[in-house]
């Protein structure tokens, strides 16, 4: 579940978004929907303070940590959404910091970015949860593939890295060709379709 919103510019809004996630996780737990992977939450760091002018990184990290604590108490997980390319390094840094206490925190990576195959290699370790998507933001050619076929080829390269790794790859696509390739790679690497 993803509470939509991004690029918060006020601390009160960042904290309100955090509190919305905390209430959501409590409600999911009360309804019995958070256990055994039935529901998880995804969060955009810019929605919880990443770009605030004063201490944005620290505020986003503290807010994400509070959401992770609530998710752990509810028996579910959190995935950090990826936003435009300007947030990638900061998102991966927060991910590293959160995983010190919450090793199950996942991350989204976007195949249309030139850097993503290398990011997949870095994230494919044991216990790592990685959701691969194509990407939805308008990005310049200097950082992202512009041709749909190039994006798809990158998606497949990233899938190969993630499926061969020791982590938990999550496939985010509506494309029947990519889903079939994902099934074949999962089978090749002895993965089950959970």
Per-region residue spans from a language model:
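Positively charged, amphipathic and often flexible ligand-engagement surfaces
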Residues: 2-194
